[in-house]
Amino acid sequence: MSEAWSPAPENTLESLRHGIVNTDGIEFDIRMTSDNQLVIHHDAEVSISPERINDRSKWVDEWSLDELKEEGFCSLDDLLNDSEVIEHWREKGKMVCLEFKRPHRFSPKGRRLLKNSESVNSMAKTMKLTESKLDEYEIPQQNSVFYSFFKNMKRPVLTSQIKRNWAELMPNIPTFGSRTFKRLVAYPQYLITPISRLIKRHRTAGAAMIPCAIEYFTPLYGRALIGKRVGFRDKQIKFLSSQQKGMPIYAWPARPDYEYRVLSAGLTGLTDN
């Protein structure tokens, strides 16, 4: 009898390979290391136990790529050098969403990015390096999208002359604070941004798609929104389509119990399951 399958740790080559092989695509987070390399890592702090950090900095951007790889984390180069990943990404048309993370405001690097122009330049540098690597491996432009919780995402896109698809994640969330704090900051923005305004903002900016919180389609949160509601009923889907005008919407997090309704509404679901 075969052993029960267990998922590989997050942000490892094994887990990313499994995702792109067995689904329509994957999403991961990109950060710049201390030696200006690209690592796939979600949190601003290195995701290992305090005992393993010892007396080193806890911030990802203070570690070199080799140090992070020694702890099992995957670089963008590692991913692109994997033949199975490349086959599915480049040859089989799988979609990859790359979320760009800024340094934490309290990290040494984050404290140096006090001016908005400095943050824009830092984001532009990370995005340009990423695009050059994807171009090197001939990843089709339609098979990738760049996005970030970065206000006025269009600025680093123009600064770095990015040619790939991009979008801005909204509401805008600070790099610091607990999960609860970030939600408290985000919800007021969310409540005053109906789906029609969200779509218009992305279309006007020139974004290629619309990342959208699943809360827009749930009854509880939908009722609290200012403006016309959307959901999974026929009339609500028709209204949504009239606003989209063909522009794709990626809804997140699309839990398994929402999957059928998300797909039936003509949306793309992003999930961490």
Positions of the model-derived regions?
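Phosphate-group recognition and catalysis centered on beta-loop-alpha active-site segments
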Residues: 1-273
